Amino acid sequence: MAATPRDADIKSFVIQASKDEGRGVDVKEGMSSFAFYENIMSNHITALVKVTDTGNSIERDGKKVSILEGLPIRGGEEIRFNIEDSNKNKLQGELYLNKIMDNAQTTKQDSFTIQCVSKESFTNEMQRVTKRYEGKISENVTKILQEIMKADFKPENIEETSNTYNFIGNDRKPFYICTWLGTKSIPTENYGKTGGFFFYQTQDGMNFKSVDNLLGQDIKKKYVSNDSDALPQEYDDKILNYDMNRSVDLGSNLTLGAYNNRTIYFDPYQFKYTAKTFNITEQEGVKHTGGSNEDFDFINPIFTETPTRLMSAILDLGTLPTGADAKAQL
């Protein structure tokens, strides 16, 4: 999420030249805005910085020139920042310049927006998961982050899974694999009645956490959006602006089987099949919705009575069995 807009003390915001460690420029005096984004739907953190440059920021060939020309900025430059807001909340670390946007030039100044991301965002593009993995999913996510990504994370932010899953990386990117594993992960509680895991990054590092445990946490802070300048006593802060994205399409949801569906699994080893039915009405009181379970949102019950989507799958029994050799696998 973006940091709440407020007065802040920008102690430093230094852009380092890619090929010269000792060459850099602090653009804090030209910054007009800084937005730092953490998003549970994103694998990496992002920041947007608006800068106005009068053209006398850095010396090159004996004369003062603009930042874009003087460093020069070509992408991938390391950015070291140290910011403290009016509540003494500190935000500091390193990001890397991804791109320059909204570049407007006049005879007197340049204005542009810098988009910067974490180093892990670029590492993900340069690495691939190739090995075969077996065992608990959470342990394999940890291995990928440590051995392939060399990413920063706290062990407690990789939530333990109760299930195991054997797989091969197939030369896919680490972020893709970890996000994909999240859809197959089950926390240690409520086996079979959960919504999977999120894989995301915060300023504390990478996170792999279950949807249910995230939504089941105690309330940390309360925010409100209103037309008054006053803050109601029961709230911690105000929402300055927001966008709501919600649509209702009953027909499409019925086609997708969002409320009631049935899957038939065929067992080629025993030559038999089993059928499993999902009904949204069975999730009340089990899944966390982010609010009170008493407000579990149902559509008209007549549309949840029978499966609206039928699916089939073949069980891959005997595929990728646990063990390093044939003897262990048998």
Which residues does each predicted region cover?
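Short intrinsically disordered coil segments
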Residues: M31, K63-P72, V129-G135, K222-A230
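Short beta-strand-centered interaction patches in the first periplasmic/extracellular domains
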Residues: S111-I114, S118-E120, N157-G251
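Short beta-strands and strand-coil junctions in structured, solvent-facing domains, enriched
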Residues: S57, N103-A104, F122-T123, P187-T188, ...
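Second-shell loop/turn segments in exported
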Residues: E125-G135, N163-G169
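Substrate-binding/catalytic groove segments of enzymes
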Residues: V27, M31, D152-K154, E189-N190
